[in-house]
UniProtKB/Swiss-Prot annotation:
It holds the Pfam family C1-set. The lineage of its organism: Eukaryota, Metazoa, Chordata, Craniata, Vertebrata. Heterodimer of an alpha chain and a beta chain. Beta-2-microglobulin is the beta-chain of major histocompatibility complex class I molecules. This is Beta-2-microglobulin. Its main location: secreted.
Length: 119
């Protein structure tokens, strides 16, 4: 009985230690298909390797938040870091700029990564 109590306490201590670990998210912005002006595509923002799980992700068009955005369920890797995919349909052209803005406890201000149509 005492042994199981000790094991339970050690498990709780190790889980509470996970809260202290913080990892900044890696942000990747890319289109599903090679960009062609006037041709519908999907804009993706893949955010990975972050901890804790609280995060805010916005896709932007010309600096303004895109409202119709979908995302995957929050998932975690073998190292207990988290990852998410945010995506929306868009039609690239010469004038519009697209980006992904991420707010996380590891950033003092939100980080914005622009979409590079050549990637």
């Amino acid at each position: 009985m005492a042994c199981s109590v000790v094991v339970a306490l050690l498990a709780l201590l190790s889980l509470s230690g996970l809260e202290a670990i913080q990892h900044a998210p890696k942000i990747q912005v890319y289109s599903r298909h090679p960009a062609e002006n006037g041709k519908p595509n999907f804009l993706n923002c893949y955010v990975s390797g972050f901890h804790p799980s609280d995060i805010e992700v916005d896709l932007l068009k010309n600096g303004k938040k895109i409202e119709k955005v979908e995302h995957s369920d929050l998932s975690f890797s073998k190292d207990w870091s988290f990852y998410l995919l945010y995506y929306t349909e868009f039609t690239p052209n010469e004038k519009d700029e697209y980006a992904c803005r991420v707010s996380h406890v590891t950033f003092s201000t939100p980080k914005t990564v622009k979409w590079d149509r050549n990637i």
